[in-house]
């Protein structure tokens, strides 16, 4: 039974479903709440929204795809092929969701909108993180920096979002930035909750001369 569960969790259909459902929910949060209210989310999606508000030249989904191209070119060389493949699919789903979903959730109060948007984005992110891939953007950069320079993933996310929201105060009204911060806080809490629902995915870095033997032993006990 343990082996079958392990194979199911690491199988392609299971991860495709997670990335698809998570990307759709995330896209609904961005297109149905954040974009109509002028909010920005954290991470690369927030950067794309900020650039869109600033320039209005390209839709956020197209910007997200363009910014991900050089990242995935680097990722092809430095991250695992499995993570790369799933992340490429996740990025495509999120790009299409942001651009093609034609939905505006009828929430007029900005604080309620920040709450609903945070719940949707956090839920979508949590489902994506349960897969063996990502939605591209910050996730791929964080893995690259962690592998090449030993920079902690959480540290990179924190510094990126600090810079993003600090710059937002220059380009957007203060009220919108504060509501965006509230939405990001809600999304982070929902993300943690979704991850803890079935927290079976752990990551550990093992440095040893017998890495192959250790890996085989771990897999045999799962």
Predicted region positions:
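Short amphipathic alpha-helix segments
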Residues: 209-222
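Core subunits and conserved enzymes of cellular information-processing
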Residues: 2-212
